Amino acid sequence: DEFIKVIAQQNQMHVLPDSTKVWMESGSSIKYTKAFNKKREVWLEGNSFFEVYKHEGSFFQVHINKAFIEVKGTCFQIKQTNAEKNEITLFHGKIEFNVESTGEKIIMSPSQKVMYNPNNAQTLVENVMDINWKDGRYNFKETPLSQLISIVNQIYQSNIILEGKFTKQPSFTGSIR
C-alpha cells in the first residue's frame, strides 16, 4: 500500500479524506493509506486529538505503540509523552482500546482516561473531570478556578498552583486551545 504521511511543524488541524478532524501537536505525525476510505486506519506518533466522522458500518482505527483504538464516531485525545507512557482520554462517544500483545480490550466511556505502558502492556483506567471539547478548544462555563487549574494541569501536564485566599471562589467562562 502507498501511504500519505503528515508531520506537524506546529500545532495544526488536518482533515482526513473521510472528514475526520485531527488536531496535531507540533512534532506529531500521522500516516494513512491512499485507499483510506476503504479501510479507515491511521498510525500516530506523538499527541493528537481526533474528532472522528461517523460512517455507518465502518470502523476507524488509530494505531499507537503496540496497541490500537477502535472508534465508531467520537472525540478523544491521545498523548504519547515517552516510550513508556501513552494516555487516551475520551471526551464523548465510545471507543475500544486494544492491547495487541495480550488481547486486552477496554471499552471506554466519556470522561475516562486509559494510561498504557507498551513495554509491559500494563493499563490503568481512571475517571477524569467532565471536559467539553469542540473545534480544537476546551470550553468552560462558570467552572471554579480551582477545578479549571486541575483540568489544565491534567491536559498540559503542568503544575499550576493557585495561591491566596478568596472570599468567593472565582470562576472561569471561556475557551482554551
What is the predicted role of each segment?
Residues 1-177:
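A residue-level detector for the "anchor" residue at the start of short, highly conserved motifs
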